């Protein structure tokens, strides 16, 4: 996964809303979200059929986790474990703080560099494992819009973030209780880039087969939601989001 957009609103009926695009080689097969792991029946996520892990998912406690590569760490490496395992590990816990504590205790050198997002309806974290740094770092995600790619959170050195941070900030925020997602659907499916580089777009399309292969939107309700909005909402586009519509998933 290469991009995750986070809207954190601590006092809202929906304190966490995320939109995430998975950028991958088109021929890397995956299953759409489901309960694919017999030893983890509490996990609902898409399954990468190459390595067996996942790029984003939710558990029955309302914890969401997602992972992205850091710069210059695309793809597997000999003697390194799959980073998709880490999402499953995070989703073994009952709240985001427990998940965070588990991830920061991993053997860092067993994995290539990554950015990770973990949240529940109270807390949200960005975890950074840079191959140039001996430590795993973590940060609280503040209220407002955040975008994480292979770069740091809201890092304007990322041309994608530089282009789309303001677009998401100025867009009409999703209203999950009313099933209103239009602006975010449009932005997640946008192939526009300021520099005409397809890799700088939110929705990636290249001639070499590397592209946005799916898109996910998740909303977490507060502890005291209004009638009709007590469960997380999970929406999924099984393909490029400029072509494939989002469908509501039954968790």
Indicate where each model-derived feature is located:
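N-terminal nucleophile
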Residues: 1-251
């Amino acid at each position: 996964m290469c991009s995750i957009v986070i809207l954190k609103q601590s006092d809202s009926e929906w304190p966490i809303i995320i939109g995430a695009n998975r950028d991958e080689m088109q021929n890397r097969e995956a299953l759409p979200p489901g309960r694919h792991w017999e030893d983890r029946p509490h996990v609902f996520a898409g399954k990468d059929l190459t390595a067996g892990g996942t790029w984003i998912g939710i558990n029955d406690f309302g914890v969401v986790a997602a992972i992205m590569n850091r710069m210059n760490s695309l793809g597997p490496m000999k003697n390194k474990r799959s980073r998709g395992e880490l999402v499953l590990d995070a989703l073994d816990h009952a709240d985001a703080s427990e998940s965070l504590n588990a991830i920061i205790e991993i053997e860092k050198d067993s994995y290539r560099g990554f950015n990770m997002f973990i949240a529940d309806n109270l807390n949200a974290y960005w975890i950074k494992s840079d191959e140039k740094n001996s430590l795993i770092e973590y940060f609280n995600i503040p209220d407002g819009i955040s975008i994480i790619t292979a770069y740091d959170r809201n890092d304007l050195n990322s041309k994608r973030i530089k282009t789309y941070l303001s677009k998401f900030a100025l867009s009409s925020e999703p209203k999950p209780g009313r099933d209103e997602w239009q602006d975010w659907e449009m932005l997640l499916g946008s192939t526009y880039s300021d520099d005409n580089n397809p890799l700088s777009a939110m929705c990636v399309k290249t001639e070499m087969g590397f592209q946005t292969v799916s898109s996910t939107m998740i909303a977490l309700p507060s502890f005291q939601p209004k009638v009709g909005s007590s469960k997380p909402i999970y929406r999924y586009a099984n393909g490029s989001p400029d072509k494939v519509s989002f469908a509501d998933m039954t968790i």
